[in-house]
C-alpha cells in the first residue's frame, strides 16, 4: 500500500507530527496530488554530499514542477478552477525556492518520506503483534514522550506561578509606595491647627499601621512564593537531568555504538531525526526554564527580601547552565564518519551536525568548524582538559567548513567534502606495534553562541579512531586494527583502549558481521565454518564449536603472529578469503556452490563416498585469497585430486564458472548437484564463428581454455565420452604441436608423497623459478594452465 494512503489514516499525535512535516518549504497539497509520482522517484539515489549529483537533483525539481503544471492543467469545473490556480502557484513557488539549491528539495522530500514511513511503521507496530525488542523500544520511546509532556506541564505551571509572583510583587510595590506617600504626609501636618493636626495624624497613623501590617504579611507571602517557585524549578531540573541522561547517555550513545558497528559492516546506525526532535524539545524546555529562573532573579533584585531564595536561585541557575552546556556539547556529533583507514594524499569526506542548532538559534550566526588530526596520546590529553592547543599530528587540506542550516529539515550541519591528509607525524611505537596499529582521530571543533551571545560554548568531538596508511598494501593490516577497535571498544573508554584479549564467540560475531558486509551476502558464516576457523586459529582438531566458547583470542593471535607453519596471520588469511569472494565469487557463494571453509583432509572425507567427478571448492591453506578444486576420480594412482589454487589474478583472466566448464571430468558439485545446473548461467557465451575463422585484419582469434595436463588421460573416462587432449587444448594453429612436449612426462613429480595430486605445496618453487627467470613462467609449467 502507498505510504501516503497509510499516512492519511494516522491519528492523534502521529497525525500531528505528520502534518508538521509540511509548510511553505513543501505544501501538503503537493504531497497529496502528486503522491504516486513522488513515491516512484529515486530520491535516495542522490548523493547529497557530491556536488556532481546536482544535475540529478535539478532533473527531479524540473520533473516535480512539470507534474504540478500538468496536474493543474487537467483541473476543470468550478472547484477545479481554484485548485488549478493553487497548484500553479505551488509550481512557481517551488521553482523559485529550490532553483538555485535543488539538493535542498531532495533533502526535504527524503526527510518527509522517511518520517512518514516511520510514523506509519510505528502505528502499524502499535496495532499488531511485534517483536519483544520493538515493543521494548516503543515502550521506551513512549516513556520519553510522556516525560516530555510532564515537563511541558510543570514548565507551564512554573510560568503561571512566576506570573502570579510578578503580579503579587507589583501590587506589593504599589502598596509600599503608598506607605511611603502616607509617611510623607506627616510633615505638612505641622502647619495645621492642633485640633486638625491631631485628627489627621490619627487617621494617617491608623492607615499606616494597617498598611505596614499588610506589607509585612505580603512580604512573607512573597518570600513563600519565591521559595515555592525555586523548589518547583529544582524538581523540574531533576526531571530534566533524568530525561537528558536517557537521551544523551542512553539513546545517543547507542546510536554512536551502532555507527561504530556499522564501520564493521553492521546495520546502518539509522536516522538522527528522532534524536534531534528529542534534543530540540530538551533545548526548548531548558531555555524556557532558564528564562523563568532569570526573571525570578530579577524580581528578587527588584525587591530584596532577606531569606534563602537568593542562594536557591543561584544554585538552580548554575544547574540549568550546566544542563544546557551538556546538551550543546553532547549534541555536536559526527553524522558521517571519515574513513577509518585513511590514505595520505587521498580525498575524503565527513559531516558534523548540531542536533539543537535550530532551536537555540545557533544558525543565526553560522559557526565555522575546523578539523585536525591528533594522535591517541593527544586525544587522551584533550579529554583530561590539558592544554593541547596547536598540538596536531598532521596537516589536513580543506579542513574548515561553515555550518549550514537546512530550513526544510531543520538541520544544522557542516559537510567536509574535499579534505585530504597531506602529511602525518607518527609517534614512537611501543614494542612490536606496527604503523598499522597506530591510531589517530579527527578532531572537529567550533564555537557556538546561544541566546544572542548570552552563552558561548567551545565544542569538540572526536571521530572514531583512524589508521593512516601511505600505500594500499597496508590496507589489510590497518583494517584489522579498525575491526578490533570497532568490535571491542567499551563505553566511556580512555582513547583508544581496547581489550588485548576477547572470547572466541565475541570474535566470531565480529568476523561474521564483517564477512556478510564485505561479501555483500546474507549467507554468513555457519557453525561449521566457525569450527574450521577455530581449528585454524587455535591449531586444534576439535570439531565441536562448544569446545572453543571459553577460549580467548589475543590481538597477537589475530593479526601479529603468523599461523603455525605459515607466513601470514589469521586475519590476513581471512581477509584474503573475503577479497576473492567479493571481487569474483560472490554469486557462487550466495548459490551455496562454494563450501570454502574445509581443509584438505575434510574435503577427502566428504568426497570419499561420492561418485567419480564429484568436486568441491575450498579456500587454500597455502595461498592468501586462493581457492582450490578438490575432486574424486578413482584411478590406479590415486583417488583424490587437488588443483593448484586460483587467485584474484587468475579470475581476472578467466572466470571460475568458465574454468569449471572447461574441465568436463568435473561432473557434480558436492554433494550431488549437476555442475551445469549450478554454473551454466555464469558461462561466457561461446562465439559462433569457428576457431580458424580469420578476422578482417587477417589474424586468427585465440581462445583461452583451462587445461590440467596431468589429467588429460583421465578426462575421457571421467567425462564418459571420447574426449582427447585436443578437446581441451587450443587449436594447433594457435599453439604449435612441438609446444606440447614441454609438459613434464612424469606427473608424479608434482604429487604429494602419499600420491595425492596436491600442487599447493609446489607454488613457492614455481614462483621462485619465475623470479630467477625474471619473467612470468610459461603456462605449460603451471599445473593448471590457460592455453
Swiss-Prot record:
Keyword list, A-Z: Activator, Cytoplasm, Disease variant, DNA-binding, Dwarfism, Nucleus, Phosphoprotein, SH2 domain, Transcription, Transcription regulation
Q: Residues where Phosphotyrosine occurs?
A: 90, 682, 699
InterPro entries the record matches: p53-like_TF_DNA-bd_sf, SH2, SH2_dom_sf, STAT, STAT5_CCD, STAT5a/5b_DBD, STAT5b_SH2, STAT_linker
GO biological process terms on file: activated T cell proliferation; B cell differentiation; cell surface receptor signaling pathway via JAK-STAT; cellular response to epidermal growth factor stimulus; cellular response to growth factor stimulus; cellular response to hormone stimulus; cytokine-mediated signaling pathway; defense response
Q: Which residues carry this modification: Phosphoserine?
A: 128, 193
Compartment list:
Cytoplasm; Nucleus
Primary location: cytoplasm
Domain SH2, by residue range, is 589-686
- Impact noted for substituting residue 684 to A: Abolishes interaction with INSR
Provide the Gene Ontology terms for cellular component: chromatin; cytoplasm; cytosol; nucleoplasm; nucleus; RNA polymerase II transcription regulator complex
**Superkingdom per UniProt:** Eukaryota
Function, in words: Carries out a dual function: signal transduction and activation of transcription. Mediates cellular responses to the cytokine KITLG/SCF and other growth factors. Binds to the GAS element and activates PRL-induced transcription. Positively regulates hematopoietic/erythroid differentiation.
Q: How does it assemble?
A: Upon activation, forms homodimers. Forms also heterodimers with related family members. Binds NR3C1. Interacts with NCOA1. Interacts with NMI. Interacts with SOCS7. Interacts (via SH2 domain) with INSR. Interacts with CPEB3; this inhibits STAT5B-mediated transcriptional activation.
Please give the family membership noted in the entry: Belongs to the transcription factor STAT family.
Per its UniProt record, which disorder involves this protein?
A: Growth hormone insensitivity syndrome with immune dysregulation 1, autosomal recessive: An autosomal recessive form of growth hormone insensitivity syndrome, a congenital disease characterized by short stature, growth hormone deficiency in the presence of normal to elevated circulating concentrations of growth hormone, resistance to exogeneous growth hormone therapy, and recurrent infections. Most, but not all, patients have features of immune dysregulation.
Q: What is this protein called?
A: Signal transducer and activator of transcription 5B
